[in-house]
Amino acid sequence: MLVAWSRRSARRSEVRLPFADRAEAGRELGARLEPLELDRPIVLALPRGGVPVGLEVARRLGTADQPVPLEVLVTRKIGYPPQPELGVGAIAEGGEPVLDQGLLDRLGLSADDLAETVRDERTELARRVAAYRGDRPLPALRDRAVVVVDDGLATGGTARAALRAVRRQRPSRLVLAVPVAAVQAMHALSGGPPDGADDLVVVTAPSTFRAVGYWYRDFGQLTDANVVTLLAQATASP
C-alpha cells in the first residue's frame, strides 16, 4: 500500500514494491510531494543514499523556469563505542549531537562517555562536507520550504538530528520525505518542533519494516564520487 501522510492528511493507494532503485523511489516520492504546493522549496538530501532520491524529487518539483535546488545536508550516526553499528544518536552539520537518552540510560552511558566518538564523527562530517560542497556554504534556509529527503526511515535518529539542525535556520515549512518508513519512527517525527517535521510524506509504511534495503531491488552502496556526480547532474538539469 502507498501512504502519502502528513500531520494534516492521509492518503492510500496502490504501489508496486519493492522499488527498482532509489531513482524510482524518488520519482514516486516527488509525485506525493507536488500537492503540498511548497513556497520557494529547496531539497536537502541526506547522503549518501538520500541523494539519488532527492535528485528525482527536485526534478519533479521544479520546472525549466523555476528549478528546485538540490543540496546535501551531511549527517553522521553516533555509535555505541563497543558496538559502533548500534546508533545512540546522530549529528548534522550546523547542529549539535542529538542523543537517544533512553538508550543511553539502558546502556549505562553518559554524554561524556561519547565525547571521543562525537569528536571523530565531527571530523568525518567536516570531511564529507568538503568533499561534496568544497568551500560553498549551505544555502540560506530562512523563510523557505525545506524538504529533507532520505532513502528510508528506520529508527529516525539521523533524521531527527537533521530536522533539528534545519529548524535552527527558521524555514517557513519543514518537510521530511522518504520512500519507506517504519511506523514507529514515522509517528515520532511527525509532531512538528522541536524534533518533528511540519509535514511527513512517505510512499509506504509497512507494518513489518525489516530494513530500508529490503524495500529496494537495487540498494547498492554509494561512494562520495557518486554523490558529487549526482549533485553535478542536479546543477546541470534544465
What are these model-derived regions, one by one?
Residues 1-238:
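PRPP-associated nucleotide enzymes
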